[in-house]
């Protein structure tokens, strides 16, 4: 018995998670069948093989593997006359696996997670550990332009729900030896893969350390909702502050530009959006179309977006404030006052239309394309003549709120759009309560929220305004011509 035990330890050194020795092959296979759910999960396949006269078993998830490639590998294994001279699983991989990436995996739990991630696991009688083949091929949609970030010129591709394809889209654009695509697996039940993409030597090392630390100690059962779940887990906890701490993009060209500027792009498997870090409020004014037009036109578009952002936040509160204080209006501005008689208070009308617009947005997301025309007609009737004739709304409210609703789409970030919306509604309520003092209080609260917003790491939410950086600020305020220094 002692001799047998010594011989077994010489051929298969002890590693955690596996049964050892030839006599334990059936126990090892049975345990892996149990862990992988063979017989209970219709998509999990277990297959018995004979490799060089030895028992072997292979596990793979149907729909994950490249079947032609896997069949060629298996056919080559089964044609082997013997495995004389092969010392362990790592030696087997070096000698007899050339069609795809393969590695010996001594840890059982890691091997099982690999199968769930699309890899193929094989165990061979007499070898410690298992052979893990990377022959996966995930089902995915084709690369196409995102619906929400279209451009008139430039590339018309977008990220998909496959991490490897998204990484390839970045690598295709950045052919630089300093580009790093660092892959991490989150420590939660779903084992989601995440990639940190950055330029070595240019990205903030403090940001990278903070990201790795937070991602590898993330306390979640799963990342079912993908990038938003991760964003909430890594961002500072300020649930009361509506201003976004993370930017998103579905465009590889935007992500590439951020990487080249020293930012960090976080790709999440099963997500077609990338996270852009660090985030400052002035970065939300940038838009990809600015850089597909000449500098003068790009600068004009940036100015327009800045004005629209300010108008969407302040136009209805200022109008409501002036209507409440008609004596402050010059005679030439009296047309701003409400001309028709109304029964519903203006504050109720304004807040009601704010809510109705959001209801229509939510409904439009769930409306089939076939019914979209009918939905548009119904929405126009609700916020059109019927509402005015029924004395629910006055025409002035509809005009200003229609402008706000349309102008809000000039902001490409949904999160920033809703942050300005919440601040606008807060201003309306404070003006209703305290008039001019309420307006002043609303401005102070809004500025306080912006100043106290905490990015994950970096120089602050108001950078490059505070701390002041003239070159960075100038770049964000207007579109500079491309030169050797700033290209």
PLM regions and their residue ranges:
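Membrane-embedded alpha-helical signal segments
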Residues: 1-318, 322, 326-331, 335-337, ...
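Transmembrane alpha-helical segments that form the functional core of multipass membrane systems
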Residues: 266, 273, 279-412, 416-427
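Short glycine-/small-residue-rich flexible loop motifs, especially phosphate/cofactor-binding loops
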Residues: 33, 171, 256, 357, ...
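Hydrophobic alpha-helical transmembrane segments of membrane transport and translocation systems
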Residues: 395-397, 401-487
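Long alpha-helical, hydrophobic tracts
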Residues: 142, 155-158, 175-178, 182, ...
